[in-house]
Amino acid sequence: MEKLIQSTISLFISLSLKISTKSYKSIISILFIISLLSIILTTTITVYHDPERIITTTTTTTSASKSVFTASSPKQQDKLQQEIDQHQSDNSHEQQGKRIIIFPNNFPLIKNDQLVKYYIDTMNQALQPHDLIYRNCFEYKIPQLSYSSQKIDVFSDGGGGDQSGIKCRKLSSQVNVKVSPAINKNGNMRQILTRFMQDDGLYFQEFLPFFPNLKEQLQSADDDIINKHWYQFIGSTVWLQQYGVHLMISRIIYTEVDQGLPIISLAYLQLFDRNWNELNDVELIIPDYETTTTTTTQSKYKYKSIIYPYFAPIPIYHNVKQLNTGKFFGVEDPRIMLITNEFGFEEPIIIYNSHHRKISNIDYENGGDNQGKINFKNYRSLFIGWLWKTQIGKFNLEQLPSEHTLDNHKANKNDANNNDYSKNEYIKIKELTRPNNQRNLLEKNWSLFLNHQEKLNHGYHSFIYFIYQFKDLKILKCPLSSSTTKKNNDGDDRFDSGCQWEYQINDDDNFGSGYLHGGTELINVNELLDNYLSKSSTSTSINGKQLTNSIKDRLPLNRQIWIGFARAAMRHCGCSETMYRPNMVILVKDDVPTNTNIASGKSNYRLTHVSSFMDLGIEVLPWWEDKGLCEGKNVVIPNGISSWTIENESNNLESESSTITSNNLVDYLTITITRRDTTIDLVYIKGLLNALLLNPDNNNSNNDVDDTEEGSSIFKSSVLFNVDLVKDYSSTTTTTTTKNVNKNLDCALQYSHKYCQIYGEKLKIEDEFNNKGKDKGKDKSN
């Protein structure tokens, strides 16, 4: 730009010698405009960098630097946050189209203007005036919220032995936590759909036949028309540490009736800043794993960009001519989770279920004209998707015949799916099946978790694990590598035999989820403790690290613990046709090593604790807005655990002579929930890990709970530190054993049913009281 200005000035000076004096004013005006443009171009494209961390420009990164994260000072973070807030405010008003471009914290370039140069020259992208570009410097933040005390009834399995004669109350204990009000995060549906239609991409065109009246709906000024047909719910989020943002996936459905009868269900991706403000037109610069080359010492990789928000282009089987069957097409129950991939980067994956089909047979006898008739069998199966990887076409979703096969066989004449999507780009996916590619007609409600020890051993996650069913515990182990899912249809998956059984109490073919279904993922407590210990010294305290290390030392060798939230479905239990609430579950695993190698040993699992229904003090919304809470469904569904961190918290303790500051450890868990299948809500739970593990002898002292209060911590006896806690039930599959391992689950469901009954009776009494009050008011008015 400077060279351009200098050359332009020289040109005008030389020309000025040949022109009259009257033209000088015009020349000066032109020069002023050029100078002004140069100032705008060099100042409105803002680059933020930390001058203390300047790295040589290179596109080669070794694995050692991939996990490094360094935040800027709080003052610098606040300053940049103000810029982002102003940027988003301008973008929503007079200056639409402004982008925020975020490079990861571990990006190898940081020197002033290097990000701009890399973006323009290496990535061949264009920057516009007022674009904001920076390398992330934000760290995770806990918001300031009000909390109320809540109690959770938890049932243990009694520590083994014959529990068939023991009453549930003997196995129950109470956990005390603090819970925030629900914070709604639903988007503006009119804006979401308007952007979807205006972008007019291939994915929009593919699904437009399912909602042909969208344009007319958006042209109407009545938002009730939009709200009647479109719903957003089932939100699941993760914190992207390298980018300083929350990434959320949710369902957006279209219906002609209500939220209970969708026609099509799509997945929507959006970003929020660390204060949970939604971000629009944000471009993340992510590693392009599919162009990565690996040598013996290092990996060379390029970067690509993804702009949020947008509808996730997930390949889906659909047929608009089959809508009268009562089923819907598309993505159901999406869950998002971060994994560490083989390149050492954190990468978001999703788990969801979706309708699809497989060829059941080819009928040559009734095909006619020497052609066979292709018959399909319909399934609703579980899939994994890699949000930052892509594939071309739907070759691994549908068993569609190839072109030469179609010449010899007849497809269904009503098959609208013969449209050619073979060149469309989608998110990379893969179906998850039981061993030997076995599948039920309906596969859903799997509860996912990751193995922290596996990551420590290999440096990345090789597998993802699922509780396939809680009753008669069954656990699947599925490979995470996407290598078997080709980008193009240039191979097959004949050697991919699906997931394998990691653990089964009963080695049989009796599959059934029972009343307890999958809800959130399960979080590894061992990793939670390690994450606290790995924090910088400014984020931890000496006594905090000592306490955390002492807990790790007390845990038996080779033990891992997971905590999550399932959901029970109680039908006709006293309120509504179906009631859903969260149920906390605790899963424990012990690795039993062989004489030579623990890796070749056996893994024993145990569902040690299950809670009854948890309402967490959350306001319940009626299924139909103009009717009562016990009509239709009564729904509070846990969707995902957004984050779980251990923080230092200072308490001032008054003594006779002075005030003493005491540093305590307090954990904050963020869970996403859905109410009435129409909301996305955040709820913060404070002190759950404290109650369960960190302070087993103090009965939640950090949660301001009176130690004399009835009910004590289930871990006051340090049950999770018991070496013999996990036993090998899979080797003894008697009826008595089965009753033992399911006893806590049965008790939790029994008390959940009681919760529903009491809830219904309470509402009846309240309704009667309110109706009497209304009648008295009418009498007085008369």
Curated annotation (Swiss-Prot):
Induction: Expression is regulated by SEF1, SFU1, and HAP43. The gene is BMT9. This is Beta-mannosyltransferase 9. It is found in: Membrane. The chain crosses the membrane at residues 27-47. It comes from Candida albicans (strain SC5314 / ATCC MYA-2876). One of its GO terms (biological process) is cell wall organization. Residues 1-26 are cytoplasmic. Residues 76-96 have a biased composition (Basic and acidic residues). Residues 48-782 are extracellular. The lineage of its organism: Eukaryota, Fungi, Dikarya, Ascomycota, Saccharomycotina. Keywords: Cell wall biogenesis/degradation, Glycoprotein, Glycosyltransferase, Membrane, Signal-anchor, Transferase, Transmembrane, Transmembrane helix. It holds the Pfam family BMT.
